[in-house]
């Protein structure tokens, strides 16, 4: 049995862990294409598609700015080629680089634990390691009523690879994946029908943001909320129908399942290594990334409560330090974790939501609409808002939530302020805010907070 100083299962954020110092031999195991979900089937390709939909939406809005433009053609194949030619090249380059690293052995196959710090690759190649890191990511959840229906469906893993654009898509789910793909395909001219069990889309987000986005979504998509799917069936020669508990049916040409994600931990043989899992399937780790088995660590979607690539990367950097400095362990940086949804309009969030604060602690709130700023006038924006929560006594930010144009950029100075402990008053008046830039939305929201 070949032995390594370090074995890493997963080539997404796990790839960050490979030490530059070739003091020991490293095994890197990947069951699929090199690079992980974010690069191949997740955040990166979907955001390139989303920007294409943004451009299409701008064209449709051109008349409101006195411009005579119209969207006359959508070349789906050209859009796909633009996305995947870049993605596939990055994946191939990454694989080639790792395979060519002297102290790294790349195993292309599925790893399974056979004992403490022992693995077998594709049930053929046994290896062992002093330390093993599980970074296997996550995959889409498919409810049994759909999985067992016999009806063709797509998930985020495969929807971007469809050969042609359908006339309509039925999306089961109302979270960030559902919202982003609804934006992508509606922007390209596809009729969207959404079905969600929750009373609002993006339910885990701040209530005010979730309610506002739901109202906006209903203006352009056929949205069915508090809806329970009872059956999925074929409808005619090529269509599908989703039957709901209230007796209605939602029909379309293609079915996209965006009902959440689950960690890729169920077929790793973790019990053979003494690694415990939580009820939701995530590997149980402490604040340093250690599992319940000595010498075995985990990061990213396999164990983290945050299904976010920037969190997985931060955990990987922390874990790289911990592996190199066992006497000086650092905790995972899980404070002030921001997130964004690249739908239309964008949504960005960090910190406490209104439902976290009401009845639990003192707070003050302020909301600034985009329409109350000069750049908001330029955008003709009547929907965008920035909502902030702060502690009235300490003057520190508690939470920030933005819905609107470039929300993912506008949230960043608020993330920085919260992360460094900068007070609201100092942030608002301790620096210049460029006039009449869109950042005045944030400035004005800060100034509206009534502090003691």
Protein language model features and the residues they cover:
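Glycine-rich dinucleotide-binding loop and its adjacent helix/turn
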Residues: 43, 136-191, 195, 223, ...
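Core beta-strand elements of the Rossmann-like FAD/NAD(P) dinucleotide-binding domain
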Residues: 2-4, 122-131, 245-254, 265, ...
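Flexible, glycine-rich terminal cap/loop adjacent to redox cofactors
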Residues: 2-33, 37, 44, 48-58, ...
């Amino acid at each position: 049995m070949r032995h390594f100083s370090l074995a890493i299962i997963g080539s997404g954020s796990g790839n960050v862990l490979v030490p530059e110092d070739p003091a020991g031999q490293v095994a890197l195991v990947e069951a699929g294409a090199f690079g992980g979900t974010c690069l191949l089937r997740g955040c990166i390709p979907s955001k390139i598609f989303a920007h294409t939909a943004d451009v299409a939406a701008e064209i449709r809005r051109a008349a409101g700015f006195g411009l005579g433009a119209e969207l006359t053609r959508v070349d789906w194949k050209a859009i796909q080629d633009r996305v995947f030619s870049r993605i596939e090249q990055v994946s191939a380059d990454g694989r080639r680089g790792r395979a060519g690293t002297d102290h790294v052995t790349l195993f292309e196959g599925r790893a399974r634990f056979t004992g403490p710090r022992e693995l077998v690759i594709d049930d053929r190649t046994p290896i062992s390691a002093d330390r093993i890191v599980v970074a296997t990511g996550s995959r889409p959840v498919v409810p049994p009523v759909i999985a067992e229906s016999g009806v063709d469906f797509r998930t985020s893993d495969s929807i971007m690879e469809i050969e042609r654009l359908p006339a309509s898509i039925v999306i089961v789910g109302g979270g960030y994946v559902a919202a982003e793909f609804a934006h992508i395909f509606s922007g390209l001219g596809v009729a969207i029908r959404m079905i969600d069990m929750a009373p609002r889309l993006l339910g885990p987000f701040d209530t005010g943001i979730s309610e506002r986005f739901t109202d906006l979504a209903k203006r352009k998509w056929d949205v069915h909320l508090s809806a329970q799917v009872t059956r999925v069936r074929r409808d005619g020669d090529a269509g599908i129908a989703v039957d709901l508990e209230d007796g209605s049916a939602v029909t379309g040409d293609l079915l996209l399942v965006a009902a959440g994600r689950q960690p890729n931990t169920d077929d790793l043989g973790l019990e053979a290594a003494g690694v415990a899992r939580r009820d939701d399937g995530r590997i149980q780790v402490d604040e340093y990334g250690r599992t319940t088995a000595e010498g075995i660590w985990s990061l990213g979607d396999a164990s983290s409560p945050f299904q976010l690539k920037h969190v997985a990367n931060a955990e990987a950097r922390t874990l790289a330090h911990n592996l190199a400095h066992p006497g000086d362990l650092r905790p995972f940086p899980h404070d002030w974790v921001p997130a964004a949804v690249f739908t239309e309009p964008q949504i960005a969030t960090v910190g406490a939501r209104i439902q976290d604060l009401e009845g639990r602690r003192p707070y003050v709130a302020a909301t600034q609409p985009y329409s109350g700023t000069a750049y908001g006038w330029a955008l003709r924006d009547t929907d965008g808002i920035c909502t902030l929560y702060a502690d009235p006594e300490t003057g520190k930010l508690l939470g920030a939530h933005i819905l609107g144009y470039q929300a993912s950029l506008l949230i960043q100075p608020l993330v920085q302020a919260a992360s460094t402990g900068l007070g609201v008053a100092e942030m608002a008046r301790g620096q210049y805010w460029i006039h009449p830039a869109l950042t005045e939305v944030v400035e004005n929201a800060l100034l509206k907070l009534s502090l003691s």
